[in-house]
């Protein structure tokens, strides 16, 4: 992985755009709002970068200590007036997925969504068989349910309601 100083100096990382979209969806799935990831690599936060032998730079999601999948507490970053009738996890997930769709475009968002949908059952099986307490398992499964429901809503209805 690149050293912190090298990551801070990135100006034109040229990250793969689909990978960035996929990582943003992954962070949303686990309720990780404490990160920053850009195509050019500027302003990265809680994202590692590895350099392949051909010099290509690849971002890697990391530092999940504040993710609500881990803590059970949602760090709300979306505006309170965005779908206020929904609970924090649902609202935050919908808000973030809508932001991602706007940022990456319908095609990339659709491909990322399809990749996650393909793996939903495997994710659920891993959670069901993981050595975690019942409360942690319930929290993780709720994240999965909320994520996929929100993913469907954002794909079907678009990003209406964003401030």
Sequence positions of predicted segments:
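Catalytic-core segments of enzymes that bind and process phosphorylated/nucleotide-bearing substrates
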Residues: 1-163
């Amino acid at each position: 992985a690149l050293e912190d100083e090298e990551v801070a100096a990135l100006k034109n990382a040229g990250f793969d755009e689909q990978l960035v979209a996929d990582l943003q969806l992954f962070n949303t799935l686990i309720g990780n709002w404490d990160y920053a990831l850009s195509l050019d690599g500027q302003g990265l936060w809680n994202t590692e970068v590895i350099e392949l032998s051909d010099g290509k730079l690849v971002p890697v999601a990391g530092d999940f200590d504040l993710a609500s999948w881990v803590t059970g507490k949602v760090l709300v970053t979306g505006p309170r007036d965005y779908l206020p009738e929904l609970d924090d996890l649902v609202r935050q997930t919908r808000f973030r997925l809508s932001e991602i769709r706007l940022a990456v475009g319908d095609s990339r968002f659709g491909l990322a969504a399809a990749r996650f949908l393909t793996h939903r059952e495997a994710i659920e099986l891993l959670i069901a068989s993981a050595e975690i307490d019942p409360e942690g398992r319930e929290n993780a499964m709720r994240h999965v349910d909320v994520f996929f429901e929100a993913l469907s809503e954002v794909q079907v209805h678009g990003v209406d309601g964003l401030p």
